[in-house]
């Protein structure tokens, strides 16, 4: 395939044009008085948002060379969002400033590799400075401040997120769901909740509520399919002699085996319920083992040399209470050892640290939360679908920021911590172009505060100059126009968000500065193409070979 190439200064300028196009669209949303962006959708109403990564994901430039620059900055926002869940606009603004200042230095004759070394050394020094001055989140009030700030100063969202995390803790699961009812509410689930319910409505014990409630039941855990009555009979006889009730978690129970259990329930001879085991494939056995630890039982599986016809009461799990509905199962106060449960949680945390796939990370986080006994559900309702999407984005950003604050602590917000950390760069001894790399970082870290001030209607340069002279932790509150202690204003940022924004921006910017050649597929003119606005290159009759079937 033929390729189109650009070199040296021209290549870097095209990349910078793409960086600026994306960053200019995103940075107007920064700060408490940032504006929204309206994004067209080919189907349905447009999306209104001030979430940086949501805007960045929608941007695709026509010029393929400039588009590469835009995609690199999009990677900055995406990486920051994936790691910290917030701070995407700050990361984008930092990346733009680093690229602008860095390319100016390269045009002046600086060696890009030495600039890169200086930038990396400066970022490392700033991260050490954040560690020195970070504070811990002290109580729900601090958490609410962080959450409110991330939700664009919506105190109601901040309070709800703080209440949710305050109850379930950093390891707990907080899910965000759409609600048909206008407003915002949070509910909590005690114990372990699974998404699977009973296999048959004949298993309910309360016909009004259509739920099966069991006290001190025996619980059989297996990853096998059960269809024959003979397979279950040994377990039923054991539980019957013990005078108990039985809950079966299995891959499936069907045919005569299910019919027998249903008949026993209908006639009142033996109470039991069947729930499909959680998870799929290899994850099913892992999640069953989680349940076994929580319930103090064993998973009956042929892989472990165990069979259903030789089950003992000691291999069955126990709990104080289990409630099963058509779609969910809640288990409270399992009989498992606290020591073993904590050991299992630690094992899952180690797996989470190694996991790279986002789906695996979410699954592990959910499993940790189940064993920790903490699940909260935030339900979000709005008048219109457009408002609902915008509100959901703010709740998710708020939740991510609050989690980050619990994980690594907080620093002064509103761009103050970044600007005032510049004092750490004074102690960094570098020479030549590496020293210029340090100064590039010094100038770039003032940009978030400058744009927060500009978006609020103030002189950005004047605000930066004044905050640089204030005592550490004192800054500019763009919401009110006041100068003072940022913690007192309730303007605090998670260290994790600030750190990830700086690291992601510096990583991409340093690589971009060392670029000398751009290579794209050559665009082929197709004058016979039908123009259909809104469909990119294909709409204009410009087709790349990779788009041709």
Swiss-Prot record:
GO terms for molecular function: ATP binding; ATP-dependent protein folding chaperone; isomerase activity; unfolded protein binding. Gene3D superfamilies: GroEL, GroEL-like equatorial domain, TCP-1-like chaperonin intermediate domain. The keyword ATP-binding applies. One of its GO terms (biological process) is protein refolding. It comes from the Bacteria. The keyword Iron-sulfur does not apply. One of its GO terms (cellular component) is cytoplasm. It catalyses: ATP + H2O + a folded polypeptide = ADP + phosphate + an unfolded polypeptide. Coiled coil: none annotated. It is an enzyme of class 5 (isomerase). Signal peptide: none annotated. ATP binds at residues 29-32, 86-90, 414, 477-479, 493. InterPro entries: Cpn60/GroEL, Cpn60/GroEL/TCP-1, GroEL-like_apical_dom_sf, GROEL-like_equatorial_sf, TCP-1-like_intermed_sf. Keywords: ATP-binding, Chaperone, Cytoplasm, Isomerase, Nucleotide-binding. It is found in: Cytoplasm. Its EC number is 5.6.1.7. SUPFAM superfamilies: GroEL apical domain-like (SSF52029), GroEL equatorial domain-like (SSF48592), GroEL-intermediate domain like (SSF54849). Pfam families: Cpn60_TCP1. PANTHER family: 60 KDA HEAT SHOCK PROTEIN, MITOCHONDRIAL. Forms a cylinder of 14 subunits composed of two heptameric rings stacked back-to-back. Interacts with the co-chaperonin GroES. Together with its co-chaperonin GroES, plays an essential role in assisting protein folding. The GroEL-GroES system forms a nano-cage that allows encapsulation of the non-native substrate proteins and provides a physical environment optimized to promote and accelerate protein folding. Belongs to the chaperonin (HSP60) family. This is Chaperonin GroEL 3. It comes from Frankia casuarinae (strain DSM 45818 / CECT 9043 / HFP020203 / CcI3).
């Amino acid at each position: 395939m033929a390729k189109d190439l650009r070199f040296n200064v021209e290549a870097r300028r095209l990349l910078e044009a793409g960086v600026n196009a994306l960053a200019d669209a995103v940075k107007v949303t920064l700060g408490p008085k940032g504006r929204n962006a309206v994004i067209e959708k080919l189907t349905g109403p447009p999306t209104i948002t001030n979430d940086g990564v949501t805007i960045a994901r929608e941007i695709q430039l026509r010029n393929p060379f400039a588009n590469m620059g835009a995609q690199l900055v999009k990677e900055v926002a995406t990486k920051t969002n994936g790691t910290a869940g917030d701070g995407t606009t700050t990361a984008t603004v930092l990346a733009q400033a680093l690229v602008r200042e860095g390319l100016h230095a390269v045009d002046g004759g600086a060696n890009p590799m030495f600039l890169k070394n200086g930038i990396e050394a400066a970022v490392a020094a700033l991260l050490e400075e954040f560690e020195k001055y970070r504070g811990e989140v002290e109580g729900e009030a601090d958490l609410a401040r962080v959450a409110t700030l991330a939700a664009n100063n919506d105190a109601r969202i901040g309070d709800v997120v703080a209440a949710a995390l305050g109850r379930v803790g950093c390891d707990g699961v907080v899910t965000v769901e759409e609600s048909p009812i206008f407003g915002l509410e949070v509910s909590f689930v005690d114990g372990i909740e699974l998404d699977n319910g009973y296999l048959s409505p004949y298993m309910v014990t309360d016909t009004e509520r259509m739920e099966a409630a069991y006290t001190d039941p025996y619980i059989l855990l297996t990853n096998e399919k059960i269809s024959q009555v003979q397979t279950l009979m040994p377990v039923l006889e054991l539980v019957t002699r013990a005078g108990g009730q039985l809950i079966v978690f299995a891959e499936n129970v069907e045919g005569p085996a299910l019919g027998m259990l249903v008949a026993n329930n209908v006639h009142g001879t033996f109470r039991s319920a069947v729930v499909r085991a959680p998870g799929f494939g290899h994850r099913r056995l892992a999640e069953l083992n989680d349940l076994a630890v929580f319930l103090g039982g064993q998973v009956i599986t042929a892989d472990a040399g165990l069979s259903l016809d030789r089950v003992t009461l000691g291999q069955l799990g126990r709990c104080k209470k289990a409630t099963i509905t058509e779609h969910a199962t809640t288990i409270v106060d399992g009989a498992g050892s606290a020591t073993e449960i904590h050991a299992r949680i630690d094992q899952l945390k180690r797996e989470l640290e190694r996991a790279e796939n986002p789906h695996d990370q979410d699954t592990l986080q959910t499993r940790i939360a189940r064993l920790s006994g903490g699940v909260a559900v935030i339900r979000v309702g709005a008048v219109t679908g457009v408002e609902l999407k915008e509100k959901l984005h703010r709740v998710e950003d708020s939740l991510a920021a609050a989690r980050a604050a619990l994980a690594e602590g907080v620093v002064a917000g509103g761009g103050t911590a970044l600007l005032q950390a510049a004092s750490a760069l004074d102690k960094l001894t570098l020479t030549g172009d590496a020293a210029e790399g340090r100064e590039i970082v010094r100038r770039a870290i003032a940009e978030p505060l400058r744009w927060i001030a500009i978006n609020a209607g103030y002189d950005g340069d004047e605000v930066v100059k004044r905050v640089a002279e204030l005592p550490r932790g004192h800054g500019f509150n763009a919401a009110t126009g006041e100068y003072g202690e940022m913690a007192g204003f309730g303007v605090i940022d998670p260290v994790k968000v600030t750190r990830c924004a700086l690291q992601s921006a510096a990583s991409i910017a340093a690589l971009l500065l060392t670029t000398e050649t751009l290579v794209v597929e050559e665009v082929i003119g197709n004058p016979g193409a039908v123009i259909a606005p809104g469909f990119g290159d294909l709409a204009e009759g410009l087709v790349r070979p990779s788009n041709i079937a």
